[in-house]
């Protein structure tokens, strides 16, 4: 099941932190971004296997792995060995970068294994809120 939400952005741009997209990609597709994204991106693997290329390094994505990409970081990712299922969120805001840096995300980060329970719960809450905006 693929579910993607790109909220209509209006007055949210004045907020210090705002959602620009959230989704479940099942299956995930081959993505090449030579100039990176304009937004910050968090992505975690909920099933299958994929590959992420940042710079000259390749990172294997398996269930429980996650990565963070700040804006403008060139990257490529694609499924490997069949299906790859991802949960992802993209966001912007004047203070998004500073907030993330204060949390230790001051550049590209990759983790081969995270405890997915809390991130999945948070992701599901954000997805539910984005599905029924109060705008």
What are these regions (language model features)?
Residues 14, 88-91, 114-118:
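A generic short alpha-helical patch detector that favors 3-5-residue windows
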Residues 18, 41-44, 95, 118-122:
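Amphipathic, well-ordered alpha-helical segments in soluble domains
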Residues 45-48, 78, 90, 115, ...:
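Alpha-helix boundary/capping detector
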Residues 1-65, 73, 79-81, 106-110:
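Generic protein-terminus/edge-of-domain signal
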Residues 50-56, 74-75, 83-84, 98-101, ...:
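Short C-terminal domain-edge/linker segments immediately following a structured domain
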Residues 99-135:
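Amphipathic alpha-helical segments enriched in hydrophobic/aromatic residues interleaved with Lys/Arg
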Residues 41-44, 66-69, 82-99:
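A short hydrophobic beta-strand segment most commonly corresponding to one strand
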């Amino acid at each position: 099941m693929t579910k993607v939400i790109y909220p209509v952005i209006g007055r949210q741009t004045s907020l210090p932190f705002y959602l620009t997209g959230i989704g479940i990609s099942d299956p995930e597709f081959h993505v090449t971004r030579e100039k990176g994204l304009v937004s910050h991106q968090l992505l975690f693997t909920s099933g299958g296997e994929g590959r992420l290329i940042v710079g000259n390094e390749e990172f294997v994505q398996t269930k429980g792995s996650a990565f963070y990409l700040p804006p403008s970081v060139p990257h490529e990712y694609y499924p490997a060995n069949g299906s790859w299922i991802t949960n992802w969120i993209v966001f912007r805001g004047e203070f998004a970068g500073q907030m993330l840096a204060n949390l230790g995300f001051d550049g590209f980060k990759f983790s081969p294994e995270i405890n997915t329970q809390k991130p999945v719960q948070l992701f599901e809450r954000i997805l539910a809120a984005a599905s029924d905006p109060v705008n």
